[in-house]
Amino acid sequence: MPKITHRKKRLSSFKLIVLGFAGVIVLGALILMLPFSSTAGVVTPFHEALFTSTSAVCVTGLVVQDTGSYWSAFGQTVILLLIQIGGLGVVTVAALFAMLSGRKISLMQRSTMQDAISAPKVGGIVRLTRFIVRGTFLIELIGMIVMLPTFCGNYGIKGIWMAAFHSVSAFCNAGFDILGTAENKYPSLTGYIGNPAINITIMLLIIVGGIGFLTWDDICTNKWHFKKYRMQSKVILVTTAILIIAPAVFFFFCDFTGLPLAERILASLFQSVTPRTAGFNTADLPTMTGSSKAIMILLMLVGGSPGSTAGGMKTTTLAVLILSAFSVCRKKDDAEVCGRRIDGSAVKNAAAVAVMYFLLFFVGGIVISTAEGLPLSTCLYETASAVGTVGLTLGITPQLGVLSQLILIVLMYLGRVGGLTLIYAAVSNKNQSGAKLPLEKITVG
């Protein structure tokens, strides 16, 4: 009986996470609809405000209005707050306010916090939450300070706001920029393709935000003693390194051939880092080769790591599936890595998440392509960007109809709350202590 009660508590915590994100999105949309949220002082249509709020809370970066020219200072501030809440997580922010007010965190709340940041255990969760919040603000502050000289040199005193906004947006893997003007909309960071300070700072912020809070904790606790890290941290760091270096080498030889060597290296690295849920771009994406776009779609679907500011199906999901395939080839019963066996339930979970993300990506792309009369490849790029909470686009987002925008809203939301979180929140728990059905083999492959 206690086991069932515990499961119900876990289920309610997943529902709280799902509903918490939805509540913040709706509230953000209502505020963005207000006339003083836009520079023109007009009421923003609800579907556009909802799209922007969803993109901010789900740290995606897809927009239907240029953030720099359409939204007022107030509107941009609201978007920044939504990005910060979405990056940290609704539950983490709620826990922060509870701790600041001196309230005691109950066991149920600790369990919810555990699920929200993918922590392995409830013990020490309050300490970990404090560590996450302090680390987040410190890293964002450092990123802001490093970018200050460049932005203040270009924009004067306004450069302080520019540096702060882009530091938070990069660390939270959001991809929102406020560099657009009425004459030059949706520029992202194309004007800084050869600027080492901006490129390197943004890339580091994206990577640190995307490797996960538990990996931070591991690194801070064990320093550079890689062997002492948790198995999950090792898998995350190795997978992340591979997913950065391999595509960067490909992009270097297949794209950006007209750039000087230094800019070509920066552009290749940047476009390798940013598809994994960040959404900034320094290059003109539509001009990249078809094979490069296909690689970027795969990177967008993978996304960041568990318990991070990033979305997507996660680096660990990809790693577990590949390791499981290797174990089959080697005729082993269990997948193995770093001298450890991977739990069979993790393999099943990884398969479920991968199938769910692929179906959302593919079905969404087909529907949008049919509704808009656009090439399927272009629409699949858009849906991969949405479900992976990336924010990269080939330029079609602002021109999409209401139906297609609503599809992207749903994909962004599902991509941020996470596949397993959504499944656990939606599917009721069943008592599995009864008799099992007869076992029968089925041929695959």
Residue ranges of predicted features:
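Membrane-proximal intracellular helices of multi-pass ion channels
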Residues: M1-G445
